Amino acid sequence: MVGFHDGAGEPEHADVGGGEVYPAGNFTIPVVAEDEHVTGGAVAEEVAGGQDEVGVDEYAGAVAGWGVDPYQRRQHSYDNAMSDSVSVSTYSGRLRRAQELCSRRGLAGLVLGPGEQLAYLTGLRFDTYERFSALVVPAVGEIRLVLPVVDRDVTPEERLGIKVETWVDGSSPYDLVPTGRIGVGAELVASHVLRLMPGRELVSATEVLTELFVSKEKLELEELRRASKAIDRVHAQVPQLLRPGRTEREIAADLSRLILEEHEKVDFVIVGSGPNGANPHHEFSDRILGLGDMVVVDIGGSLQSGYHSDCTRTYVVGGPGAVSRMYQVLYDAQAAAVRTVRPGVTAESVDAAAREVISAAGFGEFFIHRTGHGIGLSLHEEPFIVAGNTMELLPGMAFSVEPGIYIPGECGARIEDIVAVTEDGCELMNNRPRELL
């Protein structure tokens, strides 16, 4: 999925295992046969703000009509971010490294609100915005989970060595956070940040957290492979959905249903036909598809573990016919970018590889976003594949490669795959055909 961000960090080395590997400098985009099977089954999804369950068709329709926010989980829900597959020692090791990094960077500690950052360190996922809830990780000393007493039921077992501190209405939970120079997580809401300011120097925790998670562990890479295969199975069914006379909204509803058959949750659905495809962040509309329309389909979901899929393909209603020069340039640009991926190369070099191909063909002004973004428990994270990001790629980093060309008022095209850096190149996690379909 296209987005806009910048940044840098100092990631650590990580091993990469399994999968289809493409050494740097020797990459070709394969044509993959249609998937032989697609899993199915009715999936119920919990609606934000309540206990009721809805069936797949009803939920997909709600997503397509924005009657339900598919991103919102019920408040105070708790689940383990990596199910039972992540060991206690893994989470304990992450917490210990966070403390070491705080000491190295001169921080008294970290304070993280509910979200992906807290989930990465503890396995906990919960929402509680009105009352202060946070993981407090001091550089030295006892790690604490601060919760309002009404949310005591969301706490984990004490197996991670985390002390649970509860507070009652009328008391000040902010006194439980150390004073001094504190790294604040991006998911801590502003109202709480403001109350933490007295007696503390608040700085972003991004650099510390990026160093922790930018290179994925083996288990994380396996989850990303699973997610990529799941979204590939959805893309395999897209051509049969794109028929003249159907609306983008109808197709988005179908895609939401299919994503839920393969994932726990729908993250996003983009169906941009004809001129709508020239807007990278178009979602869907009531525009009716016509024969020969180019259609950008960018879709993603998240697994029960919290890891995301994200893949874009461009289709033509009724079949492609002759491949346009624009699309061939885009195809070549993505291949050039993927060939560039290897340890030691900077993130901006991958962006430049795609951009040079597109610019040389005369389409440079129509490539209006970065080439990619990292992916994991967050849909968009480091490394951001963008000009100015001098972060060097290391084995275990996972990110999208998604150049696009957008002609205002006419059409757009984008190809997106998730790749993981290996010891000598990269592993391509998505394997749907990249030709115009």
Language-model segments: residues:
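Active-site neighborhoods and metal-handling regions in enzymes and metal-associated proteins
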Residues: 78-437
